[in-house]
Amino acid sequence: MTTASALLDRRVATARGKSVLTRTRKTAPREDVGLRMTKPVAKMKSASASAKNSIALLRRPAPFSSAAAGLNGAANPLPDDVLHAMRQFDDRAVLVTGGSGSFGRRFVETLLQHSRARRIIVFSRDEYKHYELQQHLEPLGTERMRFFIGDVRDGDRLEIATREVDYIVHAAALKQVPAAEYNPFECMRTNVTGAENVVRAALRNNVNRVIALSTDKAANPINLYGASKLASDKIFIAANNMAGKTDIRFAVVRYGNVVGSRGSVIPFFRKLVDEGADHLPITDERMTRFWITLQQGVNFVITSFTMMRGGEIFVPKIPSMRIVDLAQCFAPDLPLRVVGIRPGEKLHEVMVTEDDSRLTLELADRYVIEPAFAWWQRAPYTASGAKTVPDGFRFASNTNTDWLDGEGLRRLLAEAF
């Protein structure tokens, strides 16, 4: 039977003769993309069936996955450094805002399986999602779990929820770019006022460590969502000055698109194929994005907690991928149709800007953007092997030196499903 790896190899070969999906480290993507815009109707039907078969193959467990062993069937343990970092949560209380969302669910599940946290608190608005998460986690035992219905816009409710809490992961956000453009007040209330409320609650309740999730869209933002997350980042970084001489520390984690998260392109493509679509829509054939899996994102947050000193923005070194390559690997026999960029979208994303470069340190697995605090000292990082990046350095999805090949895409898709 044809394996998923072999299937992708054929897709790569047929997509355009010679594909960028073979490893192209230190090589930017080519721009000469030939899109197949039309096909006979009879062939369309067989293409849709072929695409469904492709997804069935991609759903099979991969030989390698970054996911933790858990309820979703992944068979690989956490990396040693992440398991070691789990010790920081021993006998501690951890609260996750947006805890019933894609990231929150995986983070909570990982803590429940691999940590000795005293209490794990899910804080989110949706009662039904709380119920679903409770049912999902039941096989692991939920004695340590607490479920708070609340909105980050409600500062009083947050203050109650964060009492006797040691760690906060702030994952609650309105993140859909077009929705934010058309609902600006709602976006700002959740993403900016919500950030302020989390900071105030953490300061009042002496929460030890707080990490806020950010996005590549917060660097050089051109849309309201990115601007709101940039404002949120600034609030969390400045909160370290508000903490004064206490031991309360705030930091930010910034990464790109999460494979398989709700509202992302992969579930969208999957839905279209399952419904028998005769083409896949893409916004622009030149578009590139950073990609990270849910579990990789969770692991990155956990290890960032261990090294944070307060005020940093942690950026993982993750690969880029062209949207057209994702579409062709997901459903190789379906034609692609360019539908145009949506309001607020960029062709390429940036996670470290040229202006950030003078404050950026490089470690083996991440970049660390330092705060411009007078009291900040980089010695602990340089002692650990961190190096300064060249002046004018830029970490962008289109100039990245690490590009997903067919095998990498197979792993990501296998984990997503």
Model regions: which residues?
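N-terminal Rossmann NAD(P)H-binding glycine-rich loop of SDR-like oxidoreductase domains
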Residues: 93-110
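Conserved Rossmann-fold NAD(P)-dependent oxidoreductase catalytic core, especially the SDR/UDP-sugar
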Residues: 167-170, 174-230, 234, 238
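Strand-loop microenvironment adjacent to phosphate/nucleotide-handling motifs in alpha/beta enzyme folds
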Residues: 4, 11, 45, 51, ...
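Residues in the short beta-alpha loop(s) of Rossmann-like NAD(P)-binding domains
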Residues: 126, 216, 319
